[in-house]
Amino acid sequence: MSPPTRLAVVATVLACAGALFTTGTASAGTLTGDFYREADTPAARWVAANPDDSRTAAIRDRIANQPASHWLSNFNLATIEAEVSSYVGAAATAGKLPVLTLYGIPNRDCGGASAGGAPDLAAYQNWVNLIARGLAGRSTVIILEPDSIALLTCLSANEIAARNQALHTAARTLRAAGGKVYLDAGHSSWNSASEQANRLAAAGIADADGFYSNVSNFNSTANEAAFGRNLIAALNSRGITGKRQVIDTSRNGGAAGDWCGDDNTDRRIGQAPTTATGDADIDAYIWVKPPGEADGCRYAAGSFQPDLAFSLAGSPSSPPEESGSCAATYQTTSAWNGGFQGQVTVTAGSAAIAGWRVTWTLTGGQSIGQVWGGRATTSGTTVTVANESWNGALRPGATAQFGFGATGPVSTPAVTCVSA
């Protein structure tokens, strides 16, 4: 699960802490507001340099125009404070929430495709201190060291203890500087919730705000949310309460499976970044791994690859439209001359639902054919798909999907969902 390796500075910042962090509501966790979208990213630079490429529109609209985490992965003590301060200032001016991912721990990725980081833990602490100075007390969401807790196979018992101490110190240092800090929980197909809870406890999650999961991976949001609930319960049983989850949804809108996405064309971008999760245990869905950046299998880790970005973009995915206690997101999964195939993901809100109905309007020349995973009716240009008996009841945050074949021009319908 190698995250991107590139020079990147991200601080999730808002000028006023009260505007960013709330005490939590029934519809979301402890974050509010919109995420900061940096203008100068690898995806945006590629789009600007390739205006006539056939892939440009899709990459621009579905990836470059979305906010994604900005990584601090280049260990440079001379420039890091100014870099962070500049970014935090830009975010505060925009009134948005940028996301800072720190990726500089020694022995990161256990020497794999994203190897690098600080030469030792003392230097690492100096680096963290400079980042904290750059934050200067401004509210900041921080994704602290992907893989650092879930991936320990290359470390001895003494090295694990030293890393835990370093992460604990980093969390406290960054929180004192205004940080909202989340620690590494791996993902739902890796360590068990019980094992990961033990590791998080040892790494000082009691002094952090929560944990993140699915970074650089492809597991569904529903699976990650279920894993998060189990992990929160495991932490609670150890006397560590009040922790919440962040889920990386940058690449979990298609196939799951092996962590490396450099050669897999079945992967898609997932839920757009948002703090409106509809789940009090989940603070945000964030694109931690910027879509289009390689894992290190076929291409250099962290390098932007337009073919990967275009494959992940697939077809436009409209943001969830909340109505009642469910939301729906549309994605075109394939298209051909005269027709296309679409897929809709239904997500329950903060309360369980017994059923759902999704509605959208056909454009000129479109008609719906076969539908699977739901029961369709059409009235004029309005299509309504209701759940089957086996996929209508959803727990809070759980998802169901249906698909359909259609004739006519491809479009991106504004799908809406109501609970039945």
What are these language model-derived features?
Residues 322-338, 349:
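Low-complexity, acidic Ser/Thr/Pro/Gly-rich terminal tails and inter-domain linkers that flank the onset
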Residues 37-64, 173, 188-312:
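Surface-exposed substrate-engagement region within the catalytic domains
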Residues 30-134, 138, 290-305, 309-312, ...:
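N-terminal carbohydrate-binding/catalytic regions of secreted carbohydrate-active enzymes
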